[in-house]
Amino acid sequence: FAACETTAQWTLNLMLAQKGGDYLNDDGSLAVNNDTMVECLQTMKDMQDAGAMDVIAGGQPDNEEAYPLYNSGDVAAAIMPFWQTSRYLSYMTDLSGKVAIAAPPVFGDNDAVKTIGGGGTGTAVVASSPNADLAAEVFAYIKLSDTANVEVWNVLGFDPVNTAVWTDKSVTENPDNQYVQYFNTKPFDALLDVQDGIGLLTCYTDEKMPSINNMFCTETLNNVFESGMDVKEALDEAQSALQNEFGE
């Protein structure tokens, strides 16, 4: 089966962005029970009911409880950010040569958004630091320069934010690279397939998002996928609780 999450929102967020949806209205007010959200979550629930998707151990694909399910073949597919590549090399060495990286499915071939960025640990410079300018310069080099981005791929297996690296085949198809050796597809082919269709959810930078994330990953998704609660009912419940929290 394909992995369904209850402690993360990788698949739901992707589907929501593909549909042009969000967790908030344009004015920033809460809208976690909007029609697009209902459609996306219901699609996932229908897939679960059909046996094509189910809750993965630990609630999401990136945890030690889930890794054995890949090795056993119980989990056939998972939608994850590109940094998941490193987990395969660290925890699932027996699957070398058996795992493919592909662009995620879409609702329609002509959809503007094909994928979104997901996860990752943010890096920030403290503005009050006496060396803030120097720190910002160093981080800009680490995050953006060609040289550093090549090593982001070589060492970490992450998709470099400097997309110029994506077309340098001496880097992306280097036969000596551990990630090129592990996967049975060319990893950067998937990135190039979706390069012009990378979207985002604007709510990611909103102050309400931590509470929304907590609500979905502790209650809403479990209510739907573990307890069988009606999708609209679960989302209405989340909307009410969050509105109460923020006084809307």
Language model features: what each stretch is:
Residues 84-95, 108-215:
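C-terminal lobe and pocket-closing loops
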